[in-house]
Amino acid sequence: MPPLTQSVVLQPLIVPNDVGIDALHRGKIERYSFARISNAIELPKLIETQLNSFEWFRKEGLRELFEEISPITDFTGKNMELRFLDYHFGEPRYNEHECRERGITYSAPIRVNVQLRILSTGELKESEIFLGDFPLMTENGTFVINGAERVVVSQLIRSPGVYFKEEKDPTSGRSLHSAKLIPSRGAWLEFETNKRDVISVKVDRKRKIPVTILLRAVLGWRANPDGSGQWAPDNELDQRGRDEEILELFAHLETGDHQYIKATLDKDPARHAKEALLELYKRLRPGDPPTLDNARNLIEALLFNPRRYDLSRVGRYKLNKNLWEKDTRPEVRRQAPDVKVRVLLPDDIFKIVERMIQLNNGTPGLRADDIDHLGNRRVRTVGELIQQQFRVGLLRMERVIKERMSLQDPETATPNALVNIRPVVAAMREFFGGAQLSQFMDQTNPLAELTHKRRLSALGPGGLSRDRAGFEVRDVHHSHYGRICPVETPEGPNIGLIGTMSTYARVNEMGFLETPYRKVYREVPNASEWERQGLLLRDVRDLRTGELIAVRGTRVDAAVARRIAVALLRGQILREDVVDPTTGEVIAHAGQEVNRALAERIVETPLKIIKIRPVVSQEVDYLSADEEDRFVIVQANAPLDEHNRFLEGTVSVRYAGDFDDVPIERVDYMDVSPKQVVSVSTALIPFLEHDDANRALMGSNMQRQAVPLLRPDAPIVGTGMEYVAARDSGQVVVAKADGVVLSATADEIVILEDDGNERSYRLRKFMRSNQDTCINQRPIVSRGQRVRKGDIIADSSSTDNGELALGQNVLVAFMPWEGGNFEDAILVSERLVREDIFTSIHIEKYEVEARDTKLGPEEITRDIPNVGQDSLRNLDDRGIIYIGAEVQPNDILVGKITPKGETDLTAEERLLRAIFGEKAREVKDSSLRVPNGVRGKVIDVKVFTRDDDVELPVGVNQRVDVLLCQKRKISAGDKMAGRHGNKGVVSRILPIEDMPFLPDGTPVDIILNPIGVPSRMNIGQILETHLGWAAARLGYRVATPVFDGATETEIKEWLKRADLPPDGKITLYDGRTGEAFDRPVTVGYIYMMKLAHLVEDKIHARSTGPYSLVTQQPLGGKAQFGGQRFGEMEVWALEAYGAAYTLQEMLTVKSDDVVGRVKTYEAIVKGEPIQEAGVPESFKVLIKELQSLGLSVEVLSADETPVELTDDADSDLAALDGINLSGMERGEF
């Protein structure tokens, strides 16, 4: 066998038939898949949640808001009425690309038709009003705000509705139930039962009152079916809500030992509805005089007024589902309220009390709610979050309109004069710019971008706070299956509060997460049943093949019904004997396969359904979490035959959160794919099933931190998800229609589409991402090539031929090496540096603004005071650096001068001023310089001035942006990781000749510590190593999907085929001595990534620099050019060694002895002996602090004479002229 070359060149080969793998075509890379389970449906578009939600807001959400706020009348309701009619979006002024370049928001003007009606005359005035520029979503699901891409993260919150909770009484051990009625907007109602059987309620978090007060009060409200209503007349109120009426309502529940309503009535001071209203008012408004009108108005506003109380569509749906659908007394069932009714009805309150009593009585079939169940938590997507903020802006605007209506004369008033758009514009700016859920997009690589758009956060307004969130809400719940990934969540304080949608999950119109399942048919409707339907409500497909039999909307007559029934029955195996009910004749026996003739005979019988052996259809239903709890669901890996029938009689299933083995006759649904449980990031980990969950979590999170490399390389061992993840990430270019490539250059692809239209795709070249990584698109199609809609036509920075490529395939050995890989450190071959295998490009942006100051305008110029020609060599005549210039720390990028404050001029200076005019005015150098530790090449310079029609902030005359590009090779101190949570820091870069090598002379690239595997329990990396070695040697790329990947037997088979040892171990030779190591070593190809934690961003050193103004100690941190903190524990270390002089230096001259440090610096420079240290400044601060508390504190010398701590530092410093240690002159303060 030829030796394995260092650069792995992979081309698809003809697969031997007996290996038993299938080709998986994705993009231009052909993979060989170990999957045994075919996906029932294709993966959905992974960012459709964001796109659909924003589209809903544009079309429906805004209309809802304008209808909700109209009409606006003046305070009297007699003069004017303003209505918002239809609206439309204009065209954006600049496209996304231009907005990014100019640093502005990608938005379109929104215009609304407004109608003003003068009520006294009936006159109508209509006009179109500009309601501000509204940020638009790009086709990738992001917003461009002030030139930066942002994402609005979906929020996972408690759904509006009623929740019942069980609490144990600590003394008696009895189960007592409480309930919370949570609206989308308005007052909460909290019901609870005490141990004396009294049911009380809190209205809007006020004092507790017996629930019968509320029941009596609402009995005086006459509700209409549409939710509107009115109070009963005064004379009737005395008769409503009496004890007898209430006892009658709940008579069927007052059984056994506990009489809840009776006990509550005993505590109730009121006797009828009128008294109850007044009592309720007293409790809710303790200081106000209780009158019947006030009480009625208050209760109506709190519970029955749609402008103040809104259950929302979801709240009403949940309320109906919880209270009315689970009705235990259908014989007296009142009609459930219509789903359009979004206010509370008296019946809802009666039902809640009824359900509480039933729960307290232990009624079978009823139980308290699980608040962490996903049936009780819903997702607020982008559209809804924006709608909520827009509502806030409109309500502020409504207040302004009402005030203006009361001031303006109706005859002269116009819609334009009344409407002030500022509150709406401010609300939207506040939301996109600063809201907790509008986040700066993580753009490190395409996966980070995709995951950010699929994130679900329980934090934010109306959600949880991380300090108060307990363990239960963070934990994995059985209802998360297929909806929220159980693996991918941050480590740290946000663990479990921030999650990611699973691969197949989607959000339904109510905001609940749904996941797809394949329908299992256990019986087939006969022809009579199909005919009874009249019209098909869904497509009908053959249960075995998935072929279309009849389309949705087809009229079903007798002939069509027979055709459908025959097609469905053919090929099925009967579960029971088929007996003709009219003659009693047995037409077919159980276990018999139905052929066409038998099917036609069965169809003629009047039987309604025919029971068949369960068959898994291609029909897919999306189920929400509470719907799923009603069904028995089998996993995707249950073995099926070629006709999609179960091979075994019993299967492992999930039912309402429990796992069980059941007969196949009880199964309702089957998972669509093994990877539907996990998110995209987790589905990219091969052999996930062999990794511990904690390490899989780290692996998922670290893939998002992988820095795009110079030459992306797709993994040899993938999972088949790489193509989909890259396609939907938004960083690659996807063809929008079928066509032929006319031209493909480095910065543009032109495609002639089949309809004759020519479409041009501009590529992004060396653009800076939000995280300073490089985005560079490269065409992967050529002239004359045919492309299909949805094909990837250009790669981005971390994709290779349309597949996600976050790292590099490297040859790894698991062995200790001179302690160089102790504690997860990584030893790396110099080849990775020399051949730029882990080299990445980073682009940083530096900007400077020339502003108007009180002393005059700043100026961008080459004419900078006290700067030599050498420092100006790379600047053009405007004072701006040339593109292509190589720069070092402290080099000038943009020359800028700022006017200095005027001082009293001497006679000579006044003379110079008179002769030369303004030229002699003092200016200071405020140029933009390269920060410490940064070096690179200038790749772009943009100059923006007011004359160029660029929107600059007030007071800014000119802005210059400079882009600086760095090429960073892998170096000691960089963090690297695999996909299994196996992370480490590069400890040393060894020469190629010192690396251990294989028997054929191939040196390994990386040496990892074998001790890092057993305790971490991420065995996936070992299996990846073995399979990677075999696949690379055979020239394949493989896909081993999660939970359905290569088995150990298959890996051994592949190793044998590649003429490699079946245990994956081989004798290695020491590169330094040439001798063989004493035992075989595991060697193979692993996909390793370089993470965004680069040593170059973290390393930092300081000799002198800025000091804190109060304590005079050096500042901390790299950003402030600070020093290293010599803390309490470090002082203990020096004390332990008795290093008194070193300790004194640390606490004085190296820190905050102001005079001492200057004198020490001077002594070092002049080569003189260092003087004794003085008093540290922080000690003086401490004395002042104590004195400020009124304590008399004195400092005494050894002979107990007071020492005067004078501020003589200034005079001492004045003597040391010219020595500046503070960095103050550089403008740090």
Swiss-Prot record:
Gene3D superfamilies: 2.40.50.100, 2.40.50.150, 3.90.1100.10, DNA-directed RNA polymerase, beta subunit, external 1 domain (2.30.150.10), DNA-directed RNA polymerase, subunit 2, domain 6 (2.40.270.10), RNA polymerase alpha subunit dimerisation domain (3.90.1800.10)
Residues making up the signal peptide according to the UniProt record: none
SUPFAM superfamilies noted in UniProt: beta and beta-prime subunits of DNA dependent RNA-polymerase
Sample GO molecular function, one term: ribonucleoside binding
Catalysed reaction, written as an equation: RNA(n) + a ribonucleoside 5'-triphosphate = RNA(n+1) + diphosphate
EC number(s) from the headed UniProt entry: 2.7.7.6
Pfam families named among the record's database cross-references: RNA_pol_Rpb2_1, RNA_pol_Rpb2_2, RNA_pol_Rpb2_3, RNA_pol_Rpb2_45, RNA_pol_Rpb2_6, RNA_pol_Rpb2_7
Enzyme class: transferase
Alphabetically ordered keywords of this record: DNA-directed RNA polymerase, Nucleotidyltransferase, Transcription, Transferase
A single GO cellular-component term on record: DNA-directed RNA polymerase complex
GO terms classed as biological process: DNA-templated transcription
InterPro entries linked to this entry: DNA-dir_RNA_pol_bsu_ext_1_sf, DNA-dir_RNA_pol_bsu_external_1, DNA-dir_RNA_pol_su2, DNA-dir_RNAP_su2_dom, DNA-dir_RNAP_su2_hyb_sf, RNA_pol_bsu_bac, RNA_pol_bsu_CS, RNA_pol_bsu_protrusion
Domain of life: Bacteria
Similarity section: Belongs to the RNA polymerase beta chain family.
Function: DNA-dependent RNA polymerase catalyzes the transcription of DNA into RNA using the four ribonucleoside triphosphates as substrates.
Subunit and interaction comment: The RNAP catalytic core consists of 2 alpha, 1 beta, 1 beta' and 1 omega subunit. When a sigma factor is associated with the core the holoenzyme is formed, which can initiate transcription.
Protein name: DNA-directed RNA polymerase subunit beta
Organism: Roseiflexus sp. (strain RS-1)
